[in-house]
Amino acid sequence: MIPIYNQYAKNKSGYLHKDFQLFHLKDKKQQEFEFHYHDFKKIIIFLSGKVTYIIEGKAYLLKPGDILLVDNHDIHKPLIDPSETYERIIIWVNTSLIEAYRSNDCDISLCFQLIKEKKSNLIRLETNSKDKLKSILTELETIMTTDAFGSTLLSKALFIQFMIYLNRIQLTKQPHNMDGAIT
C-alpha cells in the first residue's frame, strides 16, 4: 500500500555546502524514510532494486536506468523492497551552481521546469541515451575521488556536460515518459 502523501511534511533532510555532491550507493537492508524535502535539487539515477518513489503525491515504479528529478522543496520519499539490492547514484545540486551557468541559449535548470510542465519527474531513457549519460557519470565519479591537477574544475565541467545532455533528452522526450507513474 502506498502511504498517504503529506503536503505539509516538515522534515528537511540533507545539507549541501558545495556546488554539487555525488553519492553512489548500493545496499540491501530494511530502510524506511519519512516524507522530506531539501533546499537543493536532487537527481536520482536508478540502477537496480525494487523501488517505488513518491514525489509530490505521485508514485513512480522505477526501472534500471530511470532518472528522477526532484526540485528543491518537492516532498518525496522512496519505498524500498529490502529483499533486493538497491543501487543508485544520487546527485545533490546547489541552485546557485545552476544559476551560475544560465545563459540566453542554455539554461541547465530547464529540465526541472519541464518536470512541472509535463507533470512527471521521471525520465525513462532509451539505450543510446543511457550509454551517453553512463559514460559521463562514470568519468565524473572517478574524477571526484582524486585530487589530481584540475579535478575540481573537471568535475564541474563533467557535471555541466551531464546536465546539458539531460536537458537535451528531456526536451526531445514526449509525455509518454509518464509510463512509470502509478498514481
Predicted regions and their residues:
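Residues immediately flanking
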Residues: 48, 72, 93-95
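Short, solvent-exposed loop/turn segments at secondary-structure boundaries
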Residues: 57, 66, 80-82, 177
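A hydrophobic/aromatic-rich effector-binding and dimerization subdomain
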Residues: 2-21, 79-142, 168-172
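Short, Lys/Arg-enriched, Trp-marked, Pro/Gly-tolerant hinge/linker segments that flank
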Residues: 119-128, 144-155, 164-183
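Generic protein-terminus/edge-of-domain signal
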Residues: 1-67, 74, 106-107, 117, ...
